[in-house]
Structures are given as structure tokens and as C-alpha cells.
Amino acid sequence: MQAGSAAIVGSQRITSSSLDQQVSNLQQASKPLGSQITLTAAEQPRAVLTWLIRFSIMDQLAADNGISVTQAQSQTGLSEIQSEAASSASQEGYSSATALFLGNGITPQMLPALGTWVAQETAYQTKVNGGKQITSQAESNTVTAKYNKAECQAAKSLNISVSPQFGRLDYSTYTVVAAKNTLSQPAGVPSPASTTGLTPAC
């Protein structure tokens, strides 16, 4: 791992400084929301880095499948996920879609990328469903299976490496989780770090 890198995703380097900037953006935007945002100082970089990596995986999935989306499609994707988030925010203890996004590590500056992520997923689902929207549970199940495989293959091809400072990638959820702490743990005290999703399942 290169010095100053938070993660290496394929040929793309996510620098620690760019991650620090997004974490700062998250903290600034979260201030007015007070106790709604429960991410700890340790969790914030992992939550932000999770999404930066997910965006890169989706970019690779799109490239693998000849998918490109327009700015208009990305804007539609953002509108769709904002609408979904607004309707589910209160159930999850948030006052708005913005609060829900922040609570999951998505800064206001990352929203355009989130819209593209949604648009790319939608375009892939339509493509593998014969160019039409999903209208049945059977179609949904088939498309989901294809999507999960394509996402796994994209992630695997990127040979993702996360700096131990921030944790490791759990491939079962594409989430950056705490890495096993072998330095500061007293003898005989097990680390609470998760061991799921150590490698891609494809």
C-alpha cells in the first residue's frame, strides 16, 4: 500500500487526503442534525470510504457490460434514491433524506456520484432483462442473481486493497469494516473485528 493511500481500487488511488476532505464535509453537514447522526469518529472514514469504493465497483461493472449513463440519467437516479430515502428516513430515525444519507456516510458532495451509481444499476438491470423494465418477481430474482455475480466479478477484478489504518473490505456487503487489531489488544482478548467476506465469493 502506497503511503498516503486510503485504498487502491484497480488503477485508481483513493488518497488519505481526499478521504479526509470528504470526512470533513460529512462532519460539517452533520453538525446541524445533532444526535441524529450516530457515526463515531472511527466509523466516519470507513462509512465514506465504503461508498467511494462502491462507486468504483459500479463504474467497473458498467464498463464490463458496455454501459454508459448520461448526466440526465444520473440526475434521475439521484431523484429516485432521494425520494426513496425521504419515505424511509423517519422509520430509521432521520428527519430527512439528507440526514439518512449523512448517517450512512454519503456527503452532499458525493450525491452526483450516488445518482450515477443508481443510474448504472438501473441500466444494467434493464439490459440483462432484455431491454425492458422488471415487471415480475421471477424477472427480479433472475436479474438480482446476474447483478450480484457481475458486481462480485467487477470487485474481484479491481483487486481492492484498503489501508489497515481504515480497516478492510467485507466483500459480502462491499463495506469497509474494522480490521483485526493485533497491536493494541491485551493477550487473550479477542478482537471484535468481523471475519465475513474476506474474499470475493465468485
What do the PLM-derived regions correspond to, one by one?
Residues M1-E43, K149-C202:
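Short, low-structural-confidence N-terminal segments
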Residues T15, G93, Q120, V143-Y147:
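Alpha-helical structural motif
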Residues R54, E92, T142-T144, A187-L198:
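Secretory-pathway extracellular proteins and peptide precursors enriched for disulfide-bonded cysteines
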Residues P108, Q125, N129-I160:
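Acidic/polar surface patches and capping/hinge elements
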